[in-house]
Amino acid sequence: MAKKSMIAKQQRTPKFAVRAYTRCSVCGRPHSVYRDFGLCRVCLRKMANEGLLPGVRKASW
């Protein structure tokens, strides 16, 4: 879990647009965030396995 202070700091608009970055909407993780879902890879996998994301299924080839 990310610190509450870091989550609050990220929600403010930055002085320069380049400084903006994505964070997981569930756990607050700043790295490996999928923009389509707004989730990090860990939360995405967990929620997909639980069937909480409609239309997402495991790959099989």
Swiss-Prot record:
Lineage top rank: taxon: Bacteria
Cofactor note: Binds 1 zinc ion per subunit.
Alphabetical list of InterPro entries matching this protein: Ribosomal_uS14, Ribosomal_uS14_bact, Ribosomal_uS14_CS, Ribosomal_uS14_sf
GO CC terms in record: cytoplasm; small ribosomal subunit
Entry keyword set: Metal-binding, Ribonucleoprotein, Ribosomal protein, RNA-binding, rRNA-binding, Zinc
SUBUNIT field: Part of the 30S ribosomal subunit. Contacts proteins S3 and S10.
Protein name: Small ribosomal subunit protein uS14
